[in-house]
Amino acid sequence: METFLFTSESVNEGHPDKLCDQISDAVLDACLIQDPDSKVACETCTKTNMVMVFGEITTKADIDYEQIVRKTCREIGFISDDVGLDADHCKVLVNIEQQSPDIAQGVHGHFTKRPEEIGAGDQGHMFGYATDETPELMPLTHVLATKLGAKLTEVRKNGTCPWLRPDGKTQVTIEYRNEGGAMVPERVHTVLISTQHDETVTNDQIAADLKEHVIKPVIPEKYLDENTIFHLNPSGRFVIGGPHGDAGLTGRKIIIDTYGGWGAHGGGAFSGKDPTKVDRSGAYIVRQAAKSIVAAGLARRCLVQVSYAIGVPEPLSVFVDSYGTGSIPDKEILELIKENFDFRPGMITINLDLKRGGNGRFQKTAAYGHFGRDDPDFTWETVKPLKWDKAQA
């Protein structure tokens, strides 16, 4: 039977781009806790010994940006120059302005509009995807790459592998077969892990520890065989990492944040954006739509696209593709989605409770993926029971 290879990657919370995503979302969380109507577009960049937060924020919240930056860096493990950044001594630059009044009047009419009248914060198109190949209804390549990254962080923080440092990347290649449009994973072809480490550890110990403490607990044995290839720190040395090794910027890991290269992506990043930004809220609602279709058994794979114009509440278009796996025609799946999901930004915000801060809610999304997570704060992962007039007729 014909098979093909597909690959997804992930990066750890200590990767400089992901550090920036987490700082931007930590700022968003802080704003929403005090003022759920905060308008936030917070970017972060970092390089050796420096973190800068900048963007447009309109909020009644009293925010200590420097404290948020240092706390986030510290929690990730950036506690000395040796590991790539010193949370307590790095330079923190802040350049935050108010949201443009032109955008404000178009989007929410200075709070005079009812939720269903709130316009999209910008134009754009977003995609949601779901597949029946894992219990999370996510692609297995993405799930495994992401879980390997999370496990790396876990064994670093709990002391199992004390030689680990915060920065790291993972990548998984899987051999699939196409079963009438559905994706069926056959085996793991290649596992790649590149992790930052201290000076003391040997490459042999790195490889042994990664196999025992990271790969073994994460990748089900049934997918591994004698032909599976392992590339464990293939460059041979990764001591310098974090912002010391590479500059970081919010919004540069959008495929890791979503579906690992499966489905499609409209190009908009998530982190640091409040729910009036449809880059985020639109992508969340179409994930819920796609997931609900697959969970209901109406398709084995599903892609949903939505598009918006700035200041306009109603979406311009909604599109569905079941890749030929639908138990009913795509046209009917589309009708069903339109009947069951309200794509107006103000209504997405209410239905997914996106103004609620607290519990590090959005900061949690900023590492290890926004989708396929088992966490009540990820409201868009809730499968919605579908009402269908046609079925009752």
UniProtKB/Swiss-Prot annotation:
Alphabetic keyword roster: ATP-binding, Cobalt, Cytoplasm, Magnesium, Metal-binding, Nucleotide-binding, One-carbon metabolism, Potassium, Transferase
UniProt similarity note: Belongs to the AdoMet synthase family.
Superkingdom of origin organism: Eukaryota
GO BP terms in the entry: one-carbon metabolic process; S-adenosylmethionine biosynthetic process
Note on how the cofactor is bound: Binds 2 divalent ions per subunit. The metal ions interact primarily with the substrate. Can utilize magnesium, manganese or cobalt (in vitro).
Pathway: Amino-acid biosynthesis; S-adenosyl-L-methionine biosynthesis; S-adenosyl-L-methionine from L-methionine: step 1/1
Major localisation: cytoplasm
Protein name: S-adenosylmethionine synthase 2
GO molecular function: ATP binding; metal ion binding; methionine adenosyltransferase activity
Enzyme class: transferase
Organism lineage string: Eukaryota, Viridiplantae, Streptophyta, Embryophyta, Tracheophyta
Record-listed Mg(2+) binding positions: E9
Compartment annotation: Cytoplasm
Binding site for L-methionine: E56, Q99, D246, K277
Species whose genome carries this gene: Picea sitchensis
SUPFAM superfamilies named in the record: S-adenosylmethionine synthetase
GO CC terms: cytoplasm
